[in-house]
Every structure is written in structure tokens, then in C-alpha cells.
Design a protein with these regions (language model features):
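Intrinsically disordered, low-complexity segments enriched in polar/charged residues with Gly/Pro
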Residues: 1-2, 44, 84-85, 131, ...
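Extracellular/lumenal N-termini and interhelical loops of multi-pass eukaryotic membrane proteins
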Residues: 114-149
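Extracellular/mature segments of secreted proteins
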Residues: 127-130, 152-155, 201
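Individual transmembrane alpha-helix segments
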Residues: 143-167
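Non-transmembrane, juxtamembrane loop and terminal tail segments
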Residues: 192-201
């Protein structure tokens, strides 16, 4: 597969992951699937917008760049056939690095949130009863949270989704960094029609 075609495939995969990451983060603002009575009852890590910012907004830019690489004009620099495509592939490395940073941000926040556990009402006060991640292996501890209903599985499911999706996004952006390097050094496997040639660009 050409480097431009590979980038387009990666970009097409990043878009739905970015949308899902954003939706997962939005759902976390509704603990247990219900509207929170007080914003202070929402887990702190939700307010850092890992899914909306890191896995969403910062991932849309690389995805759009990757999608446009295959259609980039290969005669972009003073009629030089190779310059346009190679520069576009080089710029994709920079956008891929932005994507890796966004995915890493979401990944770290999700891991911290999973280890810390949800903020819930223990009957006495709103607190974090699972500070050391022990609730992940011991479901009996979930009963420490009296409300909101089903807050532990809600928290666990959504942050796990964010963790997995951001990991995949980081991997895809890492692949594009390597792909972009090959495209910069070796060119794409074919020239677009404006150059009137079939050779490498």
C-alpha cells in the first residue's frame, strides 16, 4: 500500500475513535447515567477532558491531515514532482506527534481514574473510597458506594473504553509517524495525474 493510502486508512480509523472518545467523556458527566445533583459529585478526572480534548479534538486534526494526504497535489513546489508529496508526508509526522500527545494525555488520565475509582456517596460523605485500585479485583468493595446507582461499573466501563481507544489512537499515530518518515524519505508509490508521470514521488 502507498504511504498516502496507508495514511488515509489510518485517518479513517481515527475519526470514529475520536467521536467515541468524546461521547465516553460526555457520558462521564452523568454519574451512573443520571444528572449529577452537584458538579462536585463528578469524578475529578472527568473535568480534565481526556476524552473530549485528548482523544477527541487533538485527534481530529491529525485524522483530517491523514485523510487528505492521498489527494495532495504532488506538483506543490515550483513544479518539482517530489517536493509536494514529501513535504505533506513530513507535515503528517508533526500532526501524528500531536495525536500521540493527545492519546497519551487521555491514556494517563484514564489509568489514573481507573486506579483511583469513582467519586461516590459512601453514606457519610462524597469521597473516593477506592484510592489504591483494590476495587478492580474485589467486587464486594463496590458496595461502599451507596449512590449514584451503578456508579462503579459506569466509571469502570467508560474509563476502560477511553483507555483502550486512546491506546489504539496512540498506536495508529505512531504508525503514521513511521509511514510519514518513509513517505518523506522514499516518496509515495505513484505520482498524481498533474505530473504526467507514473514514477515515484
Amino acid at each position: 500500500m502507498c504511504t498516502g493510502g496507508c495514511a488515509k486508512c489510518l485517518g479513517g480509523t481515527l475519526i470514529p475513535l475520536a467521536v467515541l472518545g468524546t461521547l465516553a467523556n460526555i457520558l462521564l458527566f452523568f454519574p451512573g447515567g443520571k444528572v449529577a445533583e452537584d458538579s462536585a459529585h463528578i469524578t475529578d478526572e472527568v473535568w480534565y477532558f481526556g476524552g473530549i480534548l485528548g482523544s477527541g479534538v487533538l485527534m481530529i486534526f491529525p485524522a483530517l491531515v491523514f485523510l487528505g494526504l492521498q489527494n495532495n497535489d504532488c506538483c506543490g513546489c515550483c513544479g518539482n514532482r517530489s517536493c509536494g508529496k514529501r513535504f505533506a508526508m513530513f507535515s503528517s509526522i508533526i500532526f501524528a506527534a500531536v495525536g500521540v500527545l493527545g492519546a497519551g494525555y487521555c491514556l494517563i488520565l484514564s489509568a489514573v481514574a481507573l486506579n483511583k475509582g469513582p467519586k461516590c456517596n459512601t453514606g457519610e460523605k462524597w469521597t473516593y473510597p477506592f484510592q489504591d485500585g483494590n476495587y478492580l479485583a474485589d467486587h464486594a468493595l463496590w458496595n461502599l458506594c451507596k449512590s449514584p446507582d451503578n456508579i462503579v461499573p459506569w466509571h469502570l466501563t467508560l474509563f476502560s473504553l477511553l483507555l483502550v481507544m486512546s491506546g489504539i489512537q496512540g498506536l495508529l499515530c505512531g504508525i503514521q509517524m513511521v509511514n510519514g518518515l518513509f513517505g518523506t524519505l522514499c516518496g509515495d508509490c505513484k505520482c498524481c495525474g498533474c505530473c504526467g508521470g507514473d514514477g515515484t514521488v
